Curated annotation (Swiss-Prot):
One protein family per Pfam: Anticodon_3
Protein name as catalogued: Methionine--tRNA ligase
Role of this protein: Is required not only for elongation of protein synthesis but also for the initiation of all mRNA translation through initiator tRNA(fMet) aminoacylation.
Co-factor note (free text): Binds 1 zinc ion per subunit.
Xref: InterPro entries: Anticodon_Met, Met-tRNA_ligase_1, Met-tRNA_synth, Methionyl/Leucyl_tRNA_Synth, MetRS_core, MetRS_Zn, Rossmann-like_a/b/a_fold, tRNAsynth_Ia_anticodon-bd
Domain of life where this protein originates: Bacteria
Motif ('HIGH' region): 12-22
GO biological process assignments: methionyl-tRNA aminoacylation
Taxonomic lineage: Bacteria, Bacillati, Actinomycetota, Actinomycetes, Mycobacteriales
Binding site for Zn(2+): C144, C147, C157, C160
Motif window: 'KMSKS' region: 348-352
Principal cellular location given in the protein's record: cytoplasm
Organism annotation: Corynebacterium kroppenstedtii (strain DSM 44385 / JCM 11950 / CIP 105744 / CCUG 35717)
Length: 612
């Protein structure tokens, strides 16, 4: 029996709509992985939600003149619509402002505190001299004191990868208004990472099959590991569940302490919503289960250090020892899958500067398939990559429409025109060319599978598209349009078209994790019925998940919100050759993919930003 697969996907901030750079990093790769695993018959749980705490929401709410909760409600709904429209097959996409989430986060904090891994310390906190507001780490920039790189943030230098304290930055300034922050003494709880360093290091050393950049980064930050503050001077977030702190409205848990717990709380919420409250344990306390975490490279440290450290401390596995918490033996990540950045015509995506393409606009103009294809074949898997309209149009027209779409269209069209059905070739001989193409397609199942299993999504789709190219070359060489004119060649025509139809079917299986919307259409074009690739749906739910753990300052009960969920177990999609059945009725097909106007290659649609 295969291991259960937990697919944990980074939580997007609910401070605005998502742009295509966001979904290139966490969205499409995770869905390709989850869909493939389901096709292998494995038990998959894919979870995420909107991250609704932290200063970015406070700042945006102030700009829009609404409360933080109103802002979160608005963008939770928008993000849910965007991600569902892209076909991301979450079992549950929820949010961090639920009663269940608060209670689970506080359970981890109190257990870490009881086990001695939360230590109280006086630190220097940054405030804005003009407003008196606390400035969070990520809203302070300056020169890195370690490597000298400009633009280092108050929590981390992206150039050298080291964690930082805001007070350590050279020539620090506020990203909000450009003023020099004032540093004052404040009391916080810090996660004692040095006490967990040996356990973290031992675990990381066992992760040799990770992407090299992720493993190297994660090991490097262990070299100078320090305690890290897990509380903040802020009035929006999860309350600190300790006497003297819980009723202090200006002390909350650090957004990244609570965000990573979201994978666990979402799994627990999902279990309650399906009516099996203990179902989550199959993926979380089962040593045989495997867990994969998908995110952009700027979030590696929170998933390869902070979250594993929280789980180790919760289980009492650091140098201070301790007692395992009520939720049990939480299992560490199997792999942290990080993507690099997607830029636009050489510029970093920036909503404030207007250099942005929102998912909602893209879906409205082009639908999900072209975006999913571009991200899969040209996305930022191992290095930063650039989105240009020229490259997008070229990929869509030459590869998606002309190569894959044309193979489907001409194969089914010729079979429908000449036979009206899948031709029967029983008793007929296949040539070496026929067998070579069929063998290539069948062998490619294992090749693509190995690539997806090891998070090499670009290599996987390239292998599938190689078969598409070989199938087009086969049709060009066999010239079925000429065979159709010679009655003596009718048997040969049947073999050629049957072979081509089988390979179209094979390619559709190979491409289903990448292009599920198109895969359903191809399934039907081949004369098949039923649901091949299941799609997510949006539900409006009530915040009524039973809170079985003690919690303080929980959100109001009974609020409604939108989630993404779905029923994926009944889909027909399976990772194997599905034999073409002779006699299946075929009709003249409709184009699966639209060719785009070449003029779009210049600057994109009218609504698109112009980047010089």
């Amino acid at each position: 029996m295969s291991a259960p697969i937990l697919t944990s996907v980074a939580w997007p901030y609910a401070n605005g709509p998502r742009h295509i750079g966001h979904v290139a990093g966490f969205g499409v790769p995770s869905d390709v992985f989850a869909r493939y695993q389901r096709m292998r018959g494995r038990d998959v749980l894919m979870v995420s939600g909107t991250d609704e705490h932290g200063t970015p929401l406070l700042v945006q709410a102030e700009k829009e003149g609404v409360s933080v909760q109103q802002l979160a409600d608005t963008y939770n709904k928008q993000i849910v619509e965007d991600l569902a429209g892209l076909g991301l097959s979450y079992d549950l996409f929820t949010r961090t402002t639920t009663r269940n989430h608060y209670a689970i986060v506080q359970e981890l904090f109190t257990t870490l505190y009881s086990n001695g891994y939360m230590v109280k310390q006086t630190t220097l906190g940054a405030i804005s001299p003009s407003t008196g507001r606390t400035l969070p780490d990520r809203y302070i920039e300056g020169t890195c004191p370690i490597c000298g790189a400009p633009g280092a943030r108050g929590d981390q230098c992206d150039t050298c990868g080291n964690q930082l304290d805001p007070a350590d930055l050279i020539d620090s300034v506020s990203k909000i208004n450009g003023e020099t922050p004032k540093f004052v003494e404040t009391e916080h709880f810090l996660l004692d990472l040095p006490a967990l360093a040996d356990a973290l290091g031992e675990w990381l050393e066992s992760r040799q099959d990770w992407r090299p950049n992720v493993l190297k980064f994660s090991l490097n930050i262990l070299k100078d590991i320090k305690p890290r503050a897990m509380t903040r001077d802020i009035d929006w977030g999860v309350p600190v569940p300790l006497e003297g702190w819980a009723d202090n409205k200006f002390k909350k848990l650090y957004v990244w302490f609570d965000a990573v717990v979201g994978y666990l709380s979402a799994s627990i919420e999902w279990a309650h919503r399906i009516g099996d409250p203990d179902a989550w344990k199959k993926w979380w306390t089962n040593p045989e289960a495997k867990s994969y975490y998908f995110m952009g490279k700027d979030n590696i440290t929170f998933h390869s250090q902070i979250w594993p450290a929280e789980m180790l401390g919760y289980r009492g596995l650091g140098s201070r020892g301790g007692t395992e918490g009520k939720l049990g033996d939480l299992q560490l990540p199997t792999e942290v899958v990080s993507s690099e950045y997607l830029t636009m015509s050489g510029s970093k995506f920036s909503s404030s500067k207007g250099v942005v393409i929102y998912v909602q606009d893209f879906l409205r103009e082009f639908g999900p398939d072209p975006l999913r294809y571009f991200i899969a074949v040209a996305g930022p898997e191992n290095n930063d990559t650039d989105f240009t309209w020229d490259e997008f149009v070229r990929r869509n027209n030459n590869e998606l429409a002309n190569s894959w779409g044309n193979l489907i269209n001409r194969t089914v069209s010729m079979a429908a025109k000449n036979f009206g059905e899948v031709p029967d070739i029983s008793g007929l001989e296949l040539t070496d060319d026929d067998n070579a193409l069929l063998d290539l397609a069948e062998k490619t199942f294992d090749i693509v599978a190995d690539n997806i299993e090891h998070s090499r999504f670009r290599a996987g789709i390239n292998e599938a598209m190689h078969v598409v190219g070989e199938a087009n070359a086969y049709i060009a060489a066999q010239e079925p349009w000429k065979l159709a004119k010679d009655e003596d060649q009718r048997d040969r025509l049947a073999v050629v078209l049957h072979t081509a139809l089988q390979v179209v079917s094979d390619c559709n299986v190979l491409l289903t994790p990448y292009l599920p919307h198109a895969a359903q259409k191809v399934h039907e074009t081949l004369g098949r019925t039923g649901e091949w690739a299941a799609m997510p749906r949006i539900d409006e739910v009530t915040d009524d998940t039973p809170v079985e753990l003690m919690g303080v300052g929980l959100p109001e009960e009974g609020r409604t919100y939108h989630v993404i969920t779905g029923e994926y177990s009944h889909q027909q999609a399976a990772w194997k050759r599905i034999p073409i059945e002779a006699g299946t009725t075929l009709k003249k097909p409709k184009p699966i993919f639209a060719k785009l106007d070449p003029e779009l290659a210049e600057t994109g649609p009218e609504w698109a930003p112009v980047v010089h």
